[in-house]
Amino acid sequence: MPKLGMQSIRRRQLIDATLEAINEVGMHDATIAQIARRAGVSTGIISHYFRDKNGLLEATMRDITSQLRDAVLNRLHALPQGSAELRLQAIVGGNFDETQVSSAAMKAWLAFWASSMHQPMLYRLQQVSSRRLLSNLVSEFRRELPRQQAQEAGYGLAALIDGLWLRAALSGKPLDKPLAHSLTRHFITQHLSTD
């Protein structure tokens, strides 16, 4: 009989091991055996909890997107009466949270983005994450701008966030957070300026 609470512990171990494997060898070369070995479990445990490698990869992407959502929401909840500018900066901060810009997370996101073009479930998860970002940004810009301008500003800021993140991920160097925050802050203030 399995120990109570082991499922969540095992799932966490396997997701962490998957991120480590993707970080070291890439998603396509990360085998079930390597992941199980890193987690200190048998390969049968992966089948038990996730069916197969694709199920484990899907759970890993869900975990990363959940961490992104939490990073953004935690910052927004700290600013319930904050200005649109502060709340937009909070959304940016959540997207540049350490859970999203660590080497393992960046490599996993790149692998998932590439795989999402061929795997419907990963595509849906990617679309949910992308739409959530755009919706959050437009909603905050909408507090101070007409609808069309808010949509354009939200789309532009989403593109800037993704672009800064992608450049860092592909450079193999850590994200320059001060530069990223400076550029996004300038974009935000430029679009919210009433001059």
Curated annotation (Swiss-Prot):
Entry keywords, A to Z: DNA-binding, Repressor, Transcription, Transcription regulation
Gene3D superfamilies for the chain: Tetracycline Repressor, domain 2
Entry keyword annotation includes Heme: no
DNA-binding region per UniProt: 31-50
An example molecular function term from Gene Ontology annotations: transcription cis-regulatory region binding
Example GO BP: glycine betaine biosynthetic process from choline
Protein name: HTH-type transcriptional regulator BetI
Source lineage: Bacteria, Pseudomonadati, Pseudomonadota, Gammaproteobacteria, Enterobacterales
